[in-house]
Amino acid sequence: MTENPMQQIVMYSTLCCPDCRRAKSFLKDRGVDFVEVLIEGNAEAEGLVLRVNNGRRRVPTIQVGERFFACSPFNAQQLASELNVPLNR
């Protein structure tokens, strides 16, 4: 359902992040396939999140192919637009 169905969607998140839970529910409710990567205890993933967010630990950070964007605070309209999925179920 994304712009390019061949591009994998990766969501970098933490266990205690309410915005991450909202984003995950949003994606699941719309049938969007994605891989979740927890950055806690994962120095490589945390480093990537810091690098793509100008040194800030912003979660969730979403990767689509080579493109990254932070969805923090959670914004359903932004996420729907970025992934070309319906805003409403």
Language-model-detected regions and their locations in the chain:
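Local sequence-structure signature of Cys/Sec-based thiol-disulfide redox active-site neighborhoods
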Residues: 2-33
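Thiol-based oxidoreductase modules, predominantly thioredoxin-like and allied folds used
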Residues: 32-46, 56
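Non-catalytic, surface beta->alpha helical segment in thiol-disulfide oxidoreductase systems
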Residues: 64-89
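Small/polar loops that bind or transfer phosphate-bearing groups
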Residues: 12, 37, 41, 71
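Short, charge-rich, low-complexity interaction segments located
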Residues: 47-51
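Structural micro-motif
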Residues: 53-62
